[in-house]
Amino acid sequence: MLTHKILGLDVGSKTVGVAISDLMGWTAQGLDTLRINEELEDYGIEQLVTIIKENNVGSVVIGLPKNMNNSIGFRGEASLRYKELLKESLPDIEIIMWDERLSTMAAERSLLEADVSRQKRKKVIDKMAAVFILQGYLDSIQ
């Protein structure tokens, strides 16, 4: 059993998908999709701080999109910057970067298999990707 819950994040340029673990550390559930705007430097950090405090979160797992050759591209650099911004606001929270290659594709595939409409998929895809990221991490620590 964990002493704190773990948050999973899928960081994009317009949204951040948010997932949270149970206290056993076995399962990840979709929690929210935050709207952000990188161009205006609005990263939704205040919203995340509130979520973290309200949900007894001790660690945050941020998806790190890597290229297939293991290099880090533009989106990966943006995720690393997001980590630094979050660390400034929450210096006591453990932040883990997790290889998220293909997590959005896996989330999209599972939504397609569940016959979810395109409009509904657009609303939940980032949250689902965060679930895939967090579940991958949780499975690795079991």
Curated annotation (Swiss-Prot):
Keyword rRNA processing attached: no
Q: What range does the record give for the signal peptide?
A: none
GO cellular component terms, A-Z? cytosol
According to its UniProt entry, the protein's GO biological process terms are: rRNA 5'-end processing
EC number from the UniProt entry: 3.1.-.-
The molecular function terms of the Gene Ontology recorded here are:
nuclease activity
Q: Which InterPro entries match?
A: RNaseH-like_sf (IPR012337), YqgF (IPR005227), YqgF/RNaseH-like_dom (IPR006641), YqgF/RNaseH-like_dom_sf (IPR037027)
- Supply the alphabetized keyword list: Cytoplasm, Hydrolase, Nuclease, Ribosome biogenesis
- Family per record: Belongs to the YqgF nuclease family.
* Name listed for the protein in its UniProt record: Putative pre-16S rRNA nuclease
